[in-house]
């Protein structure tokens, strides 16, 4: 159904703005290919990344009901994005209870990820935080068929990781070197392989329950 109501598909270049901060949207954007990030900027220009988006993610489903976007979305890599008009989402919520619950679940999982990120930012040290994130990205990418043998392409720079975790690029680089040196991961370019899943999970105190990957929605 969602595929049928997409009004247009747009390809964005890496670092191109997809949804401007403070904008009013008439559609919600669904990632078909590539990586994107949700972010907010401070007056001095500093950026806080509040979410990373992978294929299959709605990046701004909340714009369906919120009149103004307090955050923005930018492409981290070349991205293919489908626009789903809010007028069509309105029709879905009126006439298709099952799909309405699917959309609602999407926003609930998005909120669960945000709550977990708040916990990691507030209560974990930097190494635990990065380990937790590497586990999360593995499971999210595995769910859409983009992993192989505990390996995946992480198309996110160390600067972008720093903007998500409140760390300098130097600190992110040092943590990744430590994880490699301890045999937990292997990384080359944008490729990440998790060599010891159990140890990395323990390092990041990672429990995937908040992703609700096996959540089922009952049909009417």
Name each region found by the language model:
Residues 1-14, 68:
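Short proline/glycine- and basic residue-enriched helix-capping loop/turn segments at helix->loop/beta transitions
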Residues 98-166:
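Polybasic "coupling" helices that flank or enter modular domains
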Residues 140-220:
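Phosphate-/nucleic-acid-contacting segments
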